[in-house]
């Protein structure tokens, strides 16, 4: 029986997977990548110094895994938020933790990964996903007795703006275009003022989409 030949594409795909596995094994753990010398505020692995605006938060605030390491079961089911969200948004912004995987090679179990369901500006996502920027020093734990008040939110009624007439020059151009195209419509052209809704700049998914991160992780 003739031996079946292996397609070159399958060999290339296998080699790609082997390279990816080696890179993953050789990649330094988060406890090494994000280790910080609190005296010089330099990360030993990269040799980079934290930006000036992060110095105060590094000494006063905590990383996410630093908070969760003090709680039973690493705080599963608890609510965590960020100081920047509390300052910038009036609507509730928080993560409800569903899964935590600490880095057991870290000295104080203060590094690792976490997953949760995001509520941003009062809108809750349907599925849990990995929490980004867990190494930043601006995470805060919502006390249990304050969770009900923190999550309560009544959205304000949205008012649909009324359309307004076009400026005279634009109106004349639109009517001339209609006449040129043979449009017999006599409807007055109106300008809609309805806003196109976009996610805020600090929405976590928008930050994940950025391929190039400026500066050093706080």
Swiss-Prot record:
Coiled coil: none annotated. GO terms for cellular component: mitochondrial inner membrane; mitochondrial small ribosomal subunit. One of its GO terms (molecular function) is structural constituent of ribosome. Its main location: mitochondrion. It is found in: Mitochondrion. Required for mitochondrial translation, plays a role in maintaining the stability of the small ribosomal subunit and the 12S rRNA that are required for mitoribosome formation. It comes from Bos taurus (Bovine). Keywords: Mitochondrion, Ribonucleoprotein, Ribosomal protein. Residues 178-218 are annotated as: Disordered. Pfam families: MRP-S34. Belongs to the mitochondrion-specific ribosomal protein mS34 family. This is Small ribosomal subunit protein mS34. Component of the mitochondrial ribosome small subunit (28S) which comprises a 12S rRNA and about 30 distinct proteins. GO terms for biological process: mitochondrial translation.
């Amino acid at each position: 029986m003739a031996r079946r030949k292996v397609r070159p594409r399958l060999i290339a795909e296998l080699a790609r997977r082997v390279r990816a596995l080696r890179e993953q094994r050789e990649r330094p753990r988060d406890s090494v990548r994000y280790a910080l010398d609190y005296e010089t505020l330099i990360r030993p692995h990269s040799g980079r110094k934290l930006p000036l605006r992060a110095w105060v938060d590094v000494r006063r605030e905590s990383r996410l895994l630093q908070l969760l390491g003090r709680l039973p079961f690493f705080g599963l089911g608890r609510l965590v938020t960020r100081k920047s969200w509390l300052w910038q948004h009036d609507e509730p912004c928080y993560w409800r933790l569903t899964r935590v995987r600490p880095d057991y090679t870290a000295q104080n179990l203060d590094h690792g990964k976490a997953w949760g369901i995001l509520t941003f500006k009062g809108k809750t996502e349907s599925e849990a996903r990995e929490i980004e920027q867990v190494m930043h020093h601006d995470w805060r734990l919502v006390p249990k007795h304050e969770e009900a008040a923190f999550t309560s939110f009544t959205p304000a009624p949205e008012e649909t703006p009324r359309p307004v007439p076009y400026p005279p020059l634009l109106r004349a151009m639109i009517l001339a275009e209609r006449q040129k195209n043979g449009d017999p419509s006599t409807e007055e052209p109106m300008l809609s003022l309805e806003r196109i809704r976009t996610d805020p700049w600090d929405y976590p998914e928008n930050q994940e989409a950025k391929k190039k991160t400026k500066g050093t992780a706080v």
